[in-house]
């Protein structure tokens, strides 16, 4: 299937202040978005795709000046693909606090004339959803045919169905969870500690020092990456294979340099991430993950939290995902069924762990293709 081809982001400016869940207010902010396909006359074929931790508005296609810049969900979104841009108008939004053009820690604070840095207010999933709703308003979209996301993006999709029930026809929540477990919060805390303890962090004002806390970011990414893969997947990819600088394949070097393939892989992923991502953004997004808990206001009762939803749901999980295990998706399914909502659920047998939601798995893609076919028939797309 063909790619959607060359795409270009656009920057949307919002003068109306946005009050955040923390009580802080952001005024005169911007959000970077990309769109694919055409919005129909009835404005009924719009799909919002919400991104996960290190992704962005760049969901599909490539940029003219970089043919390697393929969108993070390009295998899923495009002409003839499961989310078919010949039939749907797809929107990707870079969230507040990110480092890919939307207002965030790297942006200039108008009160000081310097980057916000650590002074950028803490944001939540709910704050992102409110900001995304303003994007929808700007496009004249009263109701999305679907809001979809994987992992943290799935949390946003679920939040949309809670916060704007009348504006979401279908919620597609993939490899997600109704709240983080203590173990997941612990992983985030260790990652944040690596960043905060980096001497180049400078209290979050490293921009003024001309440095980046790359050592901390590397470790944070390495920790995260371990949780995205399954044990079986790591065993198949790396096993205990050696990767020594001198090329030896059958002997230990008895040092603390890289000796195993898996070590080399993690260091490569950490180095790559530290080159393009912002440490303050990493702190913000992991804290947003920690705070997401729609049942908290209902004494932990998820069924009560979902009582006023109106959407139809597709919930999907992956058998080897231990970061957000299938049992967590089934919690959402049970709460929705308790509320007599229309729910489709699939647990896909895939060896790739949490990252499976990003990969081109035939069963997974066929599931989404069939579900979007149903939506297309509903909206006449």
Swiss-Prot record:
GO terms for molecular function: homoserine O-acetyltransferase activity; homoserine O-succinyltransferase activity. The record marks 323 as: Important for acyl-CoA specificity. It is found in: Cytoplasm. The lineage of its organism: Bacteria, Pseudomonadati, Pseudomonadota, Betaproteobacteria, Burkholderiales. The keyword Amino-acid biosynthesis applies. One of its GO terms (biological process) is methionine biosynthetic process. Pfam families: Abhydrolase_1. NCBIfam families: homoserO_Ac_trn, PRK00175.1. Residues 45-360 form the AB hydrolase-1 domain. Its EC number is 2.3.1.46. The active site is at 151 (nucleophile), 321, 354. Keywords: Acyltransferase, Amino-acid biosynthesis, Cytoplasm, Methionine biosynthesis, Transferase. This is Homoserine O-succinyltransferase. It is an enzyme of class 2 (transferase). It comes from Burkholderia ambifaria (strain MC40-6). Pathway: Amino-acid biosynthesis; L-methionine biosynthesis via de novo pathway; O-succinyl-L-homoserine from L-homoserine: step 1/1. The keyword Cytoplasm applies. InterPro entries: AB_hydrolase_1, AB_hydrolase_fold, HAT_MetX-like. Belongs to the AB hydrolase superfamily. MetX family. Homodimer. Transfers a succinyl group from succinyl-CoA to L-homoserine, forming succinyl-L-homoserine. Its main location: cytoplasm. It comes from the Bacteria. Substrate binds at residues 221, 355.
């Amino acid at each position: 299937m063909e790619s959607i081809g060359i795409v270009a982001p656009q920057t949307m400016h919002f003068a109306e202040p946005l009050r955040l869940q923390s009580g802080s207010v952001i005024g005169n902010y911007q959000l970077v978005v990309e769109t694919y396909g055409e919005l129909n006359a009835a404005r009924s074929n719009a799909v919002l795709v919400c991104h996960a931790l290190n992704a962005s508005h760049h969901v599909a296609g490539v940029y003219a000046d970089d043919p390697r810049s393929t969108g993070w969900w390009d295998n899923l979104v495009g002409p003839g693909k499961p989310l078919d841009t010949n039939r749907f108008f797809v929107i990707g939004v870079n969230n507040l606090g990110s480092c890919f053009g939307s207002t965030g820690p790297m942006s200039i604070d108008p009160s000081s004339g310097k980057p916000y840095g650590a002074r950028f207010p803490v944001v939540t999933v709910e704050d992102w959803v409110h900001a995304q709703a303003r994007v929808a308003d700007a496009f004249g979209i009263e109701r999305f045919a679907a809001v979809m996301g994987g992992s943290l993006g799935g949390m946003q999709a679920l939040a949309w169905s809670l916060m704007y029930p009348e504006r979401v026809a279908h919620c597609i929540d993939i490899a997600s969870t109704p709240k983080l477990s203590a173990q997941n919060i612990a992983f985030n805390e260790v990652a944040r500690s690596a960043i905060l303890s980096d001497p180049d962090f400078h209290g979050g004002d490293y921009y003024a020092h001309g440095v980046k806390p790359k050592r901390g970011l590397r470790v944070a990414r390495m920790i995260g990456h371990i949780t995205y893969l399954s044990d079986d997947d790591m065993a198949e990819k790396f096993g205990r294979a050696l990767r020594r600088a001198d090329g030896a394949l059958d002997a230990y070097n008895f040092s603390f340099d890289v000796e195993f393939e898996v070590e080399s892989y993690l260091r490569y992923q950490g180095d790559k991430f530290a080159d393009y991502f912002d440490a303050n953004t990493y702190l913000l997004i992991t804290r947003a993950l920690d705070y997401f808990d729609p049942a908290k206001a209902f004494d932990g009762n998820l069924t009560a939290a979902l009582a006023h939803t109106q959407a139809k749901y597709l919930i999907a999980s992956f058998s080897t995902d231990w970061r957000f295990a299938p049992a967590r998706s089934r919690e959402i399914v049970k709460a929705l069924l308790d509320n007599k909502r229309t729910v489709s659920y699939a647990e896909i047998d895939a060896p790739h762990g949490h990252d499976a939601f990003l990969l081109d798995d035939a069963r997974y893609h066929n599931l989404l293709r069939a579900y979007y076919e149903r939506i297309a028939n509903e909206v006449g797309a």
